[in-house]
């Protein structure tokens, strides 16, 4: 059993607590592929899990509904990422305040050149090529919001984070909206 805290921007804030009654990992998420006892390049496609809360969230100034994408995000868009992950690229250091930064949506070709792991059309590439602005260890599952729409979910990137020419990789939600809606419909 686990729970979520909704609307938290600082560790000392009083927020909404909700138990998670069920989780739904995407059925095609298979991060470790082995063939002939040899590890192949990791493929983190379909890196997505939905959580069903034991009771609905209260919509407030700090807890809002966000739109799912209805069209492809545009390369060059400025997007907001946030998370509670490490603030130190090389070590585990966690903040007392939710961290947010604006980054740019890049072509997937930039990430294909940067990584030996597979970058697929189920992913988005975002960051700053000069480095310094990135999600980091512990931020996975956080939002990538472009023009007020939830376009991606933080998936993976370089270690250490924030390296030049090593943008972050995000699950591309436009590819999963049918699955999301189906799971929500079947589990009201």
UniProtKB/Swiss-Prot annotation:
Q: Which GO terms describe its biological process?
A: regulation of systemic arterial blood pressure; zymogen activation
Question: What Enzyme Commission number(s) appear in the record?
Answer: 3.4.21.35
Gene3D superfamilies the record matches: Trypsin-like serine proteases
Name of the protein in question: Glandular kallikrein-3, submandibular
**Known function:** Glandular kallikreins cleave Met-Lys and Arg-Ser bonds in kininogen to release Lys-bradykinin.
Q: Which domain of life is it from?
A: Eukaryota
> Which keywords appear in this protein's UniProt record, sorted alphabetically?
Disulfide bond, Glycoprotein, Hydrolase, Protease, Serine protease
Domain Peptidase S1 per the UniProt entry, residue ranges: 1-185
The reactions it catalyses are: Preferential cleavage of Arg-|-Xaa bonds in small molecule substrates. Highly selective action to release kallidin (lysyl-bradykinin) from kininogen involves hydrolysis of Met-|-Xaa or Leu-|-Xaa
Name the protein family.
Belongs to the peptidase S1 family. Kallikrein subfamily.
GO terms of molecular function: serine-type endopeptidase activity
Pfam families named in the record: Trypsin
Q: Which positions does UniProt annotate with glycan attachment? A: 10, 36
Which SUPFAM superfamilies does the record associate with it?
Answer: Trypsin-like serine proteases
Tell me what gene encodes this: Klk3
Q: Name one GO cellular component term.
A: extracellular space
Q: Where is the active site?
A: 47, 140
Give me the disulphide-bonded residues. Answer: 79-146, 111-125, 136-161
Top EC class of this enzyme: hydrolase
């Amino acid at each position: 059993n686990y729970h979520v805290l909704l609307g938290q921007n600082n560790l000392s804030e009083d927020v909404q607590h909700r138990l998670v009654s069920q989780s739904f990992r995407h059925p095609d998420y298979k991060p470790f592929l082995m063939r002939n006892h040899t590890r192949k390049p990791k493929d983190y496609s379909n890196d997505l899990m939905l959580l069903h809360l034991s009771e609905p969230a209260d919509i407030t100034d700090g807890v809002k509904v966000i739109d799912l994408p209805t069209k492809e995000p545009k390369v060059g868009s400025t997007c907001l990422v946030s998370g509670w992950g490490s603030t130190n690229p090389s070590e585990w250091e966690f903040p007392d305040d939710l961290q947010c930064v604006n980054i740019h949506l890049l072509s997937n070709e930039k990430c294909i050149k940067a990584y030996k792991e597979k970058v697929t059309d189920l992913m988005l590439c975002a960051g700053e090529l000069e480095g310094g602005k990135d999600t980091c260890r512990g931020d996975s599952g956080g939002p990538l919001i472009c023009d007020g729409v939830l376009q991606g979910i933080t998936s993976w990137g370089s270690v250490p984070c924030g390296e030049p020419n090593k943008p972050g990789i995000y699950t591309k939600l436009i590819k999963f909206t049918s699955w999301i809606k189906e799971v929500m419909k079947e589990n009201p």
